[in-house]
């Protein structure tokens, strides 16, 4: 009897603790729906694809989880993998590494397995794929030969030993700590082969809307959130992945993820058609934030950034805005001409004109990338390669040496929406505009280069045309978001080497074994420098060689970095907990909490219904 009473007492004491484990208020409560302006609408949610927008990584970090990650200070820590270790196979004389995976599930309830990682990485290394992240995987045995089509994916030193054990065989003895850091890149997250294969098979019309990476109904995610709604110009909705580190039968809904939904409405967006004022998307979003209808603001233009400057938090992103030069162009084929154009840029003036705390680039590899160890800075160790102000005297001298006095060049830049959406916004409202950092940079570059005697034609390229413009080389100069998101300098430098570009490779017998970078650069000396470092284990020697490679890249100048991206945000007082970020600058919203969310969400639902009725009445009267 005493034992029974004692057990009841223990249960009674534990009940409040169990209840406290959940933030939900009642059986029907799923959690807060938090309206926010996370970032601009993403043009692809394929983590391994060429990213058109650097800030898309902020969304990737919410819906995908790679094997490892970093804490705020840059120390590698577990992600999907909870443990990793090295092993020397004496029998086969091979260097191996193993990752043990956590038990978690995709957003459709299927367990995340080592096979999903194998598929994602083999997909990046496929000759049919176009991914700038391939070089991060080249330490794996036969990876380069697989990418070139010389070997098949079956020859790759990558195996799922079982559902939760991933085995990697290296080409040579390699620093497993360095590789553990490399695979924290969000681009190396696992993907589901069955989902992607079925989507490709069913998309017989090659419809952009039916691509798996642009369709919420098709996508599955292994991160804390899943994509619940994805409609360009209208909304992005992320919903709790109820299977993320959670037993669906035993655990509370909010065991691993507190908020139910994060919703960004782009259409305001339900503008009063009688309003004649013009404004940018960011200004509309700021107005919503000020009115208490949005609780997190994560994207700004110059005006709105200045408005909230005293309250924003800013983190570096390991991405840059970069100009690619077409080295096959008659004017640009001489490296001295490309160097001159780089020297003439006033990077600080461009950053000031954009006005969002971006950082003028002083080298091709951005600040925050590791040098000899985690926590050391490659950019600081390497010093300045670029001037942040225009050096017109140097530019003029280089052009004189090259014997070039001018000419006409087309400078392309991204408009980060599809043409139909852009036209639809203009036709419907006539008042929404975009303040584009890419356009501001282009206008500044145009002025700088025309002062040297060139004629510069600005060419806006819409989102659906941008990748084909890059791949075809149909540009003279093009501005790109070089969204590498890696702490390894080799990831920024390798794609310019012929064998490391990550571009598609034809496997026909009469085709070239490798496809050069989009810039068309092909330089044997540069290729040799990369060959010498790709398998190098000693991090000090490796860093020295990588600095030499960056110097060589500046000499060849197929590309030049203009500024380093940052991400800034502010949030409403209803957000109860400080938002945490990791070393990459990605925010963690899995523990985001909002005061009075039931009352707030109820009010929002009522307002939404009233707005819908009003619009319906207006449409009927207009009809």
Language-model-detected regions and their locations in the chain:
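N-terminal lobe/hinge region of extracytoplasmic solute-binding protein
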Residues: 37-90, 220
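Detector for C-terminal structural segments
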Residues: 235, 342-376, 428, 437-446, ...
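Surface-exposed binding/hinge segments that line
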Residues: 133-202, 229-231
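Ligand-site clamp/hinge motif
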Residues: 244-304
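Alpha-helical secondary-structure segments
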Residues: 114-120, 163-167, 224, 259-261, ...
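Structural transition elements
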Residues: 358-401, 416-425, 430-438
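Aromatic- and charge-enriched surface segment that lines or borders ligand/interaction sites
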Residues: 83-136, 167, 331-333
């Amino acid at each position: 009897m005493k034992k029974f009473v004692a057990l009841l007492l223990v249960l009674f004491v534990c009940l409040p603790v169990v209840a406290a484990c959940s933030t939900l208020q009642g059986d029907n409560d799923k959690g807060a729906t938090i309206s926010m302006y996370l970032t601009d609408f993403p043009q692809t949610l394929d983590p391994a694809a060429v990213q058109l927008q650097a800030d898309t990584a902020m969304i990737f970090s919410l819906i995908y989880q790679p094997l490892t990650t970093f804490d705020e200070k840059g120390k590698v820590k577990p992600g999907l993998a909870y443990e990793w270790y090295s092993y020397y196979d004496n029998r086969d004389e091979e260097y191996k590494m193993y990752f043990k995976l956590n038990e978690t599930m995709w957003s459709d309830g299927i367990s995340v397995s080592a096979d999903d990682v194998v598929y994602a990485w083999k997909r990046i290394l496929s000759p049919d794929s176009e991914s700038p992240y391939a070089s991060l995987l080249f330490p794996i045995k036969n990876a380069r030969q697989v990418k070139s089509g010389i070997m098949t994916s079956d020859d790759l030193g990558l195996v799922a030993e079982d559902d939760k054990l991933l085995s990697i065989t290296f080409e040579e003895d390699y620093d497993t700590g360095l590789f553990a850091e490399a695979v924290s890149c969000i681009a190396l997250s696992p993907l589901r082969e069955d989902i992607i294969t079925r989507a490709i098979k069913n998309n017989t019309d090659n419809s952009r809307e039916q691509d798996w990476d642009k369709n919420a109904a098709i996508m599955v995610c292994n991160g804390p959130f899943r994509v619940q709604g994805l409609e360009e110009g209208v909304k992005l909705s992320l919903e709790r992945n109820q299977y993320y580190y959670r037993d669906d039968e035993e655990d509370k809904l909010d065991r691993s993820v507190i908020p139910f939904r994060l919703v960004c409405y782009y259409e305001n967006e339900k503008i009063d058609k009688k309003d004649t004022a013009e404004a940018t998307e960011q200004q509309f979003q700021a107005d919503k934030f000020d009115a208490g209808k949005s609780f997190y603001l994560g994207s700004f233009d110059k005006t709105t950034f200045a408005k909230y400057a005293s309250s924003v938090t800013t983190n570096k992103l390991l991405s840059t805005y970069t100009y690619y030069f077409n080295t096959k162009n008659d004017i640009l084929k001489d490296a001295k001409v490309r160097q001159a154009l780089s020297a003439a840029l006033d990077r600080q003036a461009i950053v000031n004109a954009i006005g969002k705390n971006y950082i003028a680039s002083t080298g091709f590899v951005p600040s925050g990338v590791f040098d000899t160890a985690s926590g050391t800075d490659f950019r600081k160790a390497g010093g300045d390669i670029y001037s942040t102000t225009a050096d017109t005297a140097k530019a003029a001298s280089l052009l004189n040496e090259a014997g070039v006095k001018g000419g006409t060049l087309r400078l392309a830049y991204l408009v980060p929406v599809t043409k139909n959406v852009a036209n639809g916004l203009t036709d419907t409202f006539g008042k929404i505009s975009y303040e584009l950092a890419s356009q501001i940079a282009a206008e500044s570059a145009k002025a700088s280069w025309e002062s040297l005697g060139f004629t510069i034609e600005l060419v806006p390229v819409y989102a659906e045309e941008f990748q084909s413009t890059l791949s075809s080389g149909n540009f003279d100069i093009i501005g790109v978001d070089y969204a590498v998101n890696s702490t390894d300098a080799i990831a920024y430098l390798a794609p310019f080497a012929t064998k490391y570009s990550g571009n598609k490779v034809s496997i026909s017998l009469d085709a070239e074994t490798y496809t050069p970078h989009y810039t068309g650069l092909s330089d044997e000396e540069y290729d040799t420098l990369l060959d010498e470092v790709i398998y190098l284990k000693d991090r000090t020697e490796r860093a020295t060689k990588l600095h030499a490679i960056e110097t060589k890249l500046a000499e060849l100048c197929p590309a030049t970095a203009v500024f380093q991206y940052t991400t800034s945000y502010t949030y409403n007082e209803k957000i109860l907990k400080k938002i945490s970020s990791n070393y990459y600058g990605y925010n963690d919203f899995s523990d985001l909490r909002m005061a009075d969310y039931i009352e707030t969400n109820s009010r929002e639902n009522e307002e939404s219904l009233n707005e819908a009725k009003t619009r319906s009445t207006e449409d009927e009267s207009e009809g």
